[in-house]
């Protein structure tokens, strides 16, 4: 499949895909994720259409906590919703992340991973913000470079819908978010072709609606609460296969070999580095260099 090439950074690539699958964006800017929300806001103001033929409604709140609340509420009424954040901003979203995951609401948080400030402010990239969210119930997908952000972000959106699980889609702050590369760009028709429309309709059918009312945010005692928490394990057990399914759809369209894990290096290697994020490009170059030297 031939795709057009454009020079862009990781933030732009993520925003390009997010806009396609989004009906509402709840935003609040924080470095280094701000350009994603900025692009979505600009495209919405210009009347750009998503794959559903509508313009994204952008709601800027007073804080990241407010943005997360907007995402939660918007999902509850059946609108496909996205947000963009990092660092302390992501930490402010954690209370709503528990609720979003617990209610099996499909959405994507695009995160340009950044250091969580402690004894001092640090705006540069690491995974401390992402790791703080591991037990929220969000699935996590990580990309290495801007091309991977473009290629794999649709996997997060589509797998979230089919797997009924919210995704934290992340890449390294500045190192990937602001790295400009000449990459191949998705056409929205191809993104629409991958979208599980039956899952979209099912999501909308379960939205809060006065014509078929349902209760949300109920109170449960320990006996029932535990059973319900255990019941969701089947959703998470099935999720890796769903992610792999959409990675294979991407591979079929692009001729790539994306998988849940990709091995790179000699088949008889005695030591293995397990890594994710922008470091992978460096590791591959080192492997090539050492292999060439024998």
Predicted regions and their residues:
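Thiamine diphosphate
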Residues: 1-132, 137, 154, 173-174
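Conformationally flexible catalytic loops at phosphate/diphosphate-handling active centers
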Residues: 52-56, 167-262
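Short helix/loop capping segments that flank catalytic or ligand/cofactor-binding pockets
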Residues: 93, 119, 178-180, 282-284
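Conserved thiamine diphosphate
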Residues: 123-173, 197
